[in-house]
Amino acid sequence: MLDVKNTGVFSSAFIDRLNAMTNSDDGDETADAELDSGLANSKYIDSSDEMASALSSFINRRDLEKLKGTNSDSQERILDGEEDEINHKIFDLKRTLKDNLPLDRDFIDRLKRYFKDPSDQVLALRELLNEKDLTAEQVELLTKIINEIISGSEKSVNAGINSAIQAKLFGNKMKLEPQLLRACYRGFIMGNISTTDQYIEWLGNFGFNHRHTIVNFVEQSLIVDMDSEKPSCNAYEFGFVLSKLIAIKMIRTSDVIFMKKLESSSLLKDGSLSAEQLLLTLLYIFQYPSESEQILTSVIEVSRASHEDSVVYQTYLSSVNESPHDIFKSESEREIAINILRELVTSAYKKELSR
């Protein structure tokens, strides 16, 4: 289940829908994606409205708690090691904390040796702050170390903390190290690449079969992040991040549409072309619409022995036609791609009829 004790600004129906995504089997990846598919556009709009409402509510929230907070799950969010190993490390740090005052360099070195990721270091220190009978000096020193770790990298640290539970859940589902997923979420929050490049990057890093799951992971991590005591972004930044996520979900919608087109065509039957290769071609068309003909050249060269050119061109034309318009930078770029593809279809049909 989605690890949110207080769903905060989100409706229970929205949280239930997201929990259903996490609990779905691998075979239901396409079904997950279709929750925001252009084939069911009202669902996509509902999701966008929920996110807009969430952002509005986030802006109006009160100041959050100070450094120590009231979290009791700091240790559960640590990703560096198995549970028993983490328990041992935390126990050793607690023992060292009681034996050393003031805290010396050895304590800090041990902390960084045990937990290499800054988010895990902060979580471990917060766990120590929950210890009873700490002196005022110990609290002050632990707080100072936390502030030193966070200084200049607060967004990255908080993003790593807030995505940790989801990284564990999805890491288990995808058979991936949760640290990789945490890095993925950080990259999404802090990165500045185009949404199509982001989708291509995830496709390359996590594989064709996991591409929809990664979008679900990022979405759920973002929800937890926004609803956390110490979010990674301010309201303005979250607005930008939400717009990126919505754009990526539009690309996933196009992905779903395209896969349905491929399933109903003959392009995948002889094995000369892979679904991943064909999807990448579509993504490149979204990025460089004026070069659509050149982008399709490599596909045509491979497919020509088994398929008519018109089948390839028509598949891409109908997919672009049915995809959300805002995938393109402008309506004019979309029209450029459609016009080029339409001309290619017409030309291919004429050649095939003249044989």
Swiss-Prot record:
Q: Does the keyword Transport apply?
A: yes
Q: Name one GO biological process term.
A: protein secretion by the type III secretion system
The UniProt entry, under Pfam families, shows:
HrpJ, MxiC_C
Q: Name one GO cellular component term.
A: outer membrane
Report keywords, A-Z: Plasmid, Secreted, Transport, Virulence
Its main localization is secreted
Where found in the cell? Secreted; Host cell
Per the entry, what this protein does is: Necessary for the secretion of IPA invasins.
Write down what this protein is called.
Protein MxiC
Q: Which organism is it from?
A: Shigella flexneri
